[in-house]
Design a protein with these regions (language model features):
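N-terminal glycine/threonine-rich, aromatic-flanked beta-hairpin/loop signature
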Residues: 71-105
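Calycin-type beta-barrel ligand-binding domains and close structural analogs
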Residues: 38-69, 94-236
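C-terminal motif of bacterial Sec signal peptides marking the signal peptidase cleavage site
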Residues: 30-31
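Bacterial N-terminal signal peptides that target proteins for export
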Residues: 4-20
Length: 236
């Protein structure tokens, strides 16, 4: 009889080999799962980048509210165009929000950028502009943004949105306790909840700011989402 078997080293070696092979197999499975998840996130990000650019309006929502006797959502138009600047990254956009009945009344100007963050989630970062008038109506002349640099931006720190696939679209939300946007009644809110939804021809946005007592300072208490429908695609 083989003495190595009598003294157990043979069986110990086999057991050790099995453990090593098992660990290697588990590592391969984890790596494969991670790779699949990363690939899925890349495909989701690419899909969002195709859907997002364009011109949107929520006039239909406004009219439906009026017809139903509800407090109407303000009628707004939103234009979103890509920013062609290597400094801004491959997934950067200019967003301008205007009154639907008067495009000269501009309410919001932002630069939004997208990336797959360290956690593997799709992250949207939001920034306002140091000189809003310089970039006003930039959606009409997108070449203007080739001159944009990071110093032109004021990041909304803590207000990143994290996106995930949901049904036939995507949903995004921030971490409210980290986001402290200024409101009309106070310099900074204790928490701000940002929510967004994106489908191939639809975009929904809401912003609700609360004070330290939980009282709503800005935004709608009921039906907070402004629901926009795409009126035209952005032409590359």
């Amino acid at each position: 009889m083989d003495k190595s078997r009598d003294g157990h080293p043979y069986w110990h070696a086999r057991a050790w080999l099995c453990l090593v092979l098992g660990a290697l197999a588990a590592s391969v499975l984890v790596a494969c799962a991670s790779s699949r998840k990363e690939k899925t996130q890349e495909l989701d990000l690419a899909q969002m980048m195709r859907w997002l650019p364009g011109t949107y309006s929520n006039v239909a929502q406004h009219e439906a509210d009026v017809k139903a006797g509800k407090p109407p959502h303000e009628a707004l138009d939103i234009a979103i165009v890509p920013i062609d600047s290597p400094i801004m990254g491959p997934h950067a956009f200019y967003l301008q929000e205007m009154a639907a009945d008067d495009p000269r009344r501009v309410m919001v100007q932002q630069v939004i950028t997208f990336e797959i963050g360290p956690s593997g989630k799709i992250k949207e970062s939001v920034a306002t502009l140091v000189e809003p008038r310089r970039w006003r109506d930039g959606q009409l002349t997108p070449e203007l943004f080739t001159a944009m640099v990071v110093e032109d931006l004021v990041p909304m720190s803590g207000c990143d949105l994290f996106w995930k696939r949901s049904g036939d679209g995507f949903v995004g939300a921030d971490e409210p306790l980290r986001c402290h946007t200024a409101s009309h009644t106070s310099e900074a809110a204790a928490r701000t909840q940002l929510v967004a939804e994106l489908k191939s021809t639809e975009l929904a946005l809401s912003e609700q700011s609360y004070d330290s007592s939980g009282v709503l300072m800005q935004g709608r208490a009921e039906d907070p989402l402004y629901r926009f429908r795409k009126s035209n695609e952005h032409k590359q």
